[in-house]
A protein has these predicted regions:
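Short, surface-exposed ligand- or partner-binding patches at beta-edge/loop junctions that are enriched
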Residues: 95
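Rhodanese-like catalytic fold shared by cysteine-dependent sulfurtransferases
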Residues: 2-50, 62-91, 100-134
Length: 134
C-alpha cells in the first residue's frame, strides 16, 4: 500500500470518530442531574420556576445564601429524609460553597427519584454571575 493511501485512511477514520463524538447541542431528555454554568443558573433563579436548595451547613447558610433558598445540609443526619419529602416532579437547583457537595447532593437526589436537578456549583461563582445573595 502506498503511504498516501494509509494517510488518507487514517484521516478518514479520525473524521468518522470525531463526527460520531459530536454533541447535537440539544438538552438531554433523560431525567436526572446536570451541571449548569453560573450565568445559566442565575437565569433559572430569576425565572423563579425552580426550588433552590443550598446544601451547605446551617452556619454557612446563615453567613450568606441565595434569596429564597432552602437549606438542606448534605452532611446533616436527616439529609436523605429531607430529600425524600421533596416533590420528585419539581425542578430543583442545588449549590454549595465550591461545587463538590452540590454534585454529591444532586446524585443522591437522583437516587431518591427526583427527575430534574440543575447543579449550579459554588455560591461565590453564582454571586459573581449576579445571583441575588442575602
Amino acid at each position: 500500500m502506498s503511504r498516501r493511501f494509509i494517510t488518507l485512511a487514517i484521516f478518514a477514520l479520525v473524521a468518522v470518530f470525531a463526527i460520531g463524538a459530536c454533541d447535537s447541542g440539544e438538552a438531554s431528555s433523560d431525567p436526572g442531574a446536570y451541571t449548569v454554568k453560573p450565568e445559566a443558573a442565575v437565569a433559572m433563579i430569576d425565572e423563579g420556576e425552580r426550588v433552590v436548595i443550598d446544601v451547605r451547613t446551617p452556619a454557612e447558610f446563615a453567613e450568606a445564601h441565595i434569596v429564597g433558598a432552602l437549606n438542606i445540609d448534605l452532611d446533616g443526619a436527616d439529609f436523605a429524609d429531607q430529600i425524600a419529602e421533596l416533590d420528585p416532579e419539581e425542578p430543583y437547583l442545588v449549590y454549595c460553597r465550591s461545587g463538590n457537595r452540590s454534585a454529591v447532593a444532586a446524585e443522591q437526589m437522583v437516587d431518591a427519584g427526583i427527575k430534574d436537578i440543575a447543579d449550579a456549583g459554588g455560591l461565590a461563582d453564582l454571586a459573581r454571575a449576579g445571583a441575588p445573595i442575602v
